[in-house]
């Protein structure tokens, strides 16, 4: 069935007023969207920030009159409306549309990420089966891609790999499929641990090959390879801990870092690692190196 969609261009200060007003005039859903592709990272505790330029989208039953909606909004807010528009959108099979947009992706020479509803494009390649999720990483983000390509370029046979902040487990699983002897994943989120375990089982990874821990339960170790795709702030503050988790001569790859943060993160690791040139993609960077 079709829907009437109302769009308002608002500031963060207007958000609550217009959200309440739209619900009061009959909206069945209200959604906030970034109007200018402006990222928000590492917000202050107990805050839910909005973008400085936000689109507020509201859905109404198809027979709603947009002019009446706008008139009621003016009455309820006591002000002229910000930039606004209304359009009828057709319903569709959203699940099918979403699935069609997620295709197999190649990283480096050998590695593919393949959703369950697709055949592997190259049967003899290293194929990691992973369906897209909402929270933990599927290879579509530049930072994940940078880490996957780096792993594909390493000689991982016989190594122990630590995936710090494992999320979906995609990096640890990729390392195992690329030849690592064993992998360890750690994350502060219990759901991430479960997602990693489920994805490992889907890819035929034996339980003894992948150990998963909350940080407080992780044993002392020094890995041959450490990958961490988290945020710049934690990467800097945890630099002594992460450096200590890599054996002398071992390898490190870090991402989740905006381009303008790259030099600061690199500086936090320069004393302990011989660093490679920073790799940049779509405003994000990867920092890698070898433990001194």
Curated annotation (Swiss-Prot):
Question: Is Transmembrane one of the keywords UniProt gives this record?
Answer: no
Entry EC no(s): 2.1.1.-
Q: Which Gene3D superfamilies match?
A: Vaccinia Virus protein VP39
**UniProt GO BP:** methylation
Residues that bind S-adenosyl-L-methionine: 144, 165, 187, 229
According to its record, what are the GO cellular component terms? cytosol
Could you give a GO molecular-function term held by this entry? protein-lysine N-methyltransferase activity
The subcellular location is: Cytoplasm
Record-linked SUPFAM superfamilies: S-adenosyl-L-methionine-dependent methyltransferases
Keywords (alphabetical) are: Cytoplasm, Methyltransferase, S-adenosyl-L-methionine, Transferase
Does the record carry Cytoplasm as a key word? yes
Q: Which Pfam families match?
A: PrmA (PF06325)
The UniProt catalytic activity note for this protein reads: L-lysyl-[protein] + 3 S-adenosyl-L-methionine = N(6),N(6),N(6)-trimethyl-L-lysyl-[protein] + 3 S-adenosyl-L-homocysteine + 3 H(+)
Q: What class of enzyme is it?
A: transferase
The record's function comment reads: Methylates ribosomal protein L11.
The family line of this record is: Belongs to the methyltransferase superfamily. PrmA family.
HAMAP family per the UniProt record, alphabetical: Methyltr_PrmA (MF_00735)
Protein name in the entry: Ribosomal protein L11 methyltransferase
Which gene is transcribed and translated to give this protein?
A: prmA
